[in-house]
Every structure is written in structure tokens, then in C-alpha cells.
């Protein structure tokens, strides 16, 4: 997508052919920074400390991490070691495991002397596949927006609420939940997006609002607890969110607070959709609440908030009393029964084993 007058992906191969460049998302929306990752340690830090984030982008970054590692040491031992090191960085996002497995399975079949080149090629393929998957998700989600727009008065916007950032910054390009929105705007459909701030890391306020602003999408930033109120008063027509892991029965694990939005949507009769590429589906898990490991992040993310100070510097300030401990679960699970549909690259599925298998019969 565009930043200013230039088109960017969130990650790309450096001109040296070995390192990778990323948009360092820790500084958005106040500063736009590109950094170069040269080692497997750089990759691990970038994923763990959320220089990059979003399940699809985490997977692609890990794939390039394997490539960097193979250029250093293409042995089986190193391949397995890198798999373990990267897998531990963000345990909830299933795309991470999917990408690491795809890389390891592809490389194990090759002689060591061929692995480095093959690894970079496969990582680039995974990145390109992500773009195509998101483009298809956008086209399928656009149909949902069109259906709602058709019931509106001419010029009346479709009012969409989204949570966290499932935008192009969470993928290589387009995004998942935002792809249908961008396509609707390109088609000329009037939309208005309500952007949850999404505490504690404020990815809605920092990232989604930045995306919407950059692409001229009408939007309003709201506090996390305002969504239910807006739904009660008819200000939301549709909720679209992303997911970090979706189970075989249609449960969705997404940023903390998603479950509450789904409950409010159900109580007010508002359709609640989840946009996801198929690598986000964990076909081995059938009960999201019981089986998905929920990442617990540092309490400091709750106790401190980052922003631009009056002198123009980026500062972190404490917002809670010293000595007050903070819990920080990063995700929650929305049961399939609360989900209207799963927007995938193959179409919109019911959030059920039958619905998913109808679109992915090879998993039957």
C-alpha cells in the first residue's frame, strides 16, 4: 500500500540479497522508520518485540529468518535450532508455525549446498502468496459490504467497526479485515470505519487509524469500551476483525477484546465477520478456549503508554500507580457460535467444521 507517494510492502529483501528490510511499526504513527534485519537474532527480536506484528507478517518474517540462517549454516542441526528459536517468539500466532514448517519441510529435502538459495526463493514465494491471499479475501469481503450498501439510502455509508490492526501492516500488503474496506473505497462505495484504540498496545489508534488516514478512508477512533454503545444506537452495520489462530471448528483467537465485541454484536443483531487466510487455520485444534495457548505479555505494556511529547520526542509515560501489578493477556477466543462468517481466500464460510470443510475439502 502507499505511504505518501511510494508503494510499500511491510517486508522486502534488501538490495544486498541477504538482509531484509521492514517497516519498524513501534514508531508509528509518529515516525516512519525502515530498519534492516541482518541476523537470525535480529529476526527473533523483531518478532518478539513487535517491530513486526500480525499473524501473516510474523510468518513471512520468520520465513526470511530461516533464509538468513541457511546462508550462515545450512545444516539440519541449525535448521532445527532456528525453528525452535523463532517458534518461541510469539506462541499464539499459528502462521508462525505454518511458515516455519513450510520452510523446514522444503529445505530438508535438499542438499545443504542448495539450501540458502532455495530458502530465499521459498520465503519470497510465501510473501507473494500472502499478498494474493489477502487480495482474494478483499474481493470476497467486498461482497458482504456491497450487500449491506444495497440496503442503504444513496450516499449513506456502511458503518464498519474493526478491532486492533488487521490491516496491511499486519500482512505483506492489503491486510485481512481491511482489504474489503480498501476495495470498497476503490469501488466508490461510501464507508465509515470505527477504529477501536485496542489497548494496551493501541494498535488500532497507532496503526489502523494511520492506515485509514493514509488511504483517505473516512474513520473515527473510539475507545475500546465505546463499541457496544455505538451498536445499541444503530451506528454499526458490520464488524470485521482479523485472527491470529482459527480452529477447525471455527473458534477465533484474536487480539484481547475481540470476544467482547462479538458479544455486543450478537446482542444487537449485527453481523460479525472474521477475515483470514487459510494458513491461519489450525486444523489440529477443535476447542479454542481450552486448547489455544494465550500469550501473556509484560505488565509494563499496560502500565505505560507511548506518544509524542510536546517537544516532539517519542516518550513513554506511566499511567498507573507504581506498585500496582498489571495482567496482560494478548489474545482472547471468540466462540464460533458468535461469528456470522469467516472471510477466506476461497469464499465466506460458516464458522463451523462443516463450513470450513466445504471450502477446504482437502481437510476432510
Curated annotation (Swiss-Prot):
The keyword Ion transport belongs to this UniProt entry's keyword annotation: no
InterPro entries referenced in this protein's UniProt entry, alphabetically: IF-2B-related, IF-M1Pi, IF_2B-like_C, Initiation_fac_2B_a/b/d, M1Pi_N, NagB/RpiA_transferase-like
This protein's record includes keyword Amino-acid biosynthesis: yes
Example of a GO biological process term: L-methionine salvage from methylthioadenosine
Listed EC numbers: 5.3.1.23
Domain of life: Bacteria
Pathway(s) served: Amino-acid biosynthesis; L-methionine biosynthesis via salvage pathway; L-methionine from S-methyl-5-thio-alpha-D-ribose 1-phosphate: step 1/6
First-level EC class: isomerase
Site (Transition state stabilizer): 164
Example GO molecular function: S-methyl-5-thioribose-1-phosphate isomerase activity
Residue numbers binding substrate: 53-55, 90, 203, 254-255
This protein's UniProt keywords: Amino-acid biosynthesis, Isomerase, Methionine biosynthesis, Plasmid
Active site per UniProt: 244
Catalytic activity, reaction form: 5-(methylsulfanyl)-alpha-D-ribose 1-phosphate = 5-(methylsulfanyl)-D-ribulose 1-phosphate
The family this protein is said to belong to: Belongs to the eIF-2B alpha/beta/delta subunits family. MtnA subfamily.
Entry function: Catalyzes the interconversion of methylthioribose-1-phosphate (MTR-1-P) into methylthioribulose-1-phosphate (MTRu-1-P).
HAMAP family attached to this UniProt entry: Salvage_MtnA (MF_01678)
Protein name listed in UniProt: Methylthioribose-1-phosphate isomerase
Gene source species: Sinorhizobium medicae (strain WSM419)
Taxonomic placement: Bacteria, Pseudomonadati, Pseudomonadota, Alphaproteobacteria, Hyphomicrobiales
Gene: mtnA
